[in-house]
């Protein structure tokens, strides 16, 4: 009888070890779950960035105002009979 109990206890310990530390065990599961959360957050950020870029592309392809605004801001272009003032803050 003692031998049977010892064998069953050994099997239980083996199963517990595999559950906690074995491949695809609980610790692997927790690590993978954390990686999945990180990847989902990164995917959400990239999806939002893609939406902003897509909206900008749509604005540039369909709207002259967006092209004009971009030319004014990035390249300092002005219209005819228009004066451009660039105010620079003094550095202390």
UniProtKB/Swiss-Prot annotation:
Residues 1-3 are cytoplasmic. It comes from the Bacteria. Residues 28-63 form a coiled coil. The keyword Lyase does not apply. GO terms for cellular component: cell division site; cell septum; plasma membrane. InterPro entries: Cell_div_FtsB (IPR023081), FtsL/DivIC (IPR007060). The chain crosses the membrane at residues 4-21. Residues 22-92 are periplasmic. One of its GO terms (biological process) is FtsZ-dependent cytokinesis. It is found in: Cell inner membrane. Keywords: Cell cycle, Cell division, Cell inner membrane, Cell membrane, Coiled coil, Membrane, Transmembrane, Transmembrane helix. It is a single-pass type II membrane protein. The keyword Transmembrane helix applies. It holds the Pfam family DivIC. Essential cell division protein. May link together the upstream cell division proteins, which are predominantly cytoplasmic, with the downstream cell division proteins, which are predominantly periplasmic. Part of a complex composed of FtsB, FtsL and FtsQ. Belongs to the FtsB family. HAMAP family: FtsB. PANTHER family: CELL DIVISION PROTEIN FTSB. This is Cell division protein FtsB. It comes from Haemophilus influenzae (strain ATCC 51907 / DSM 11121 / KW20 / Rd).
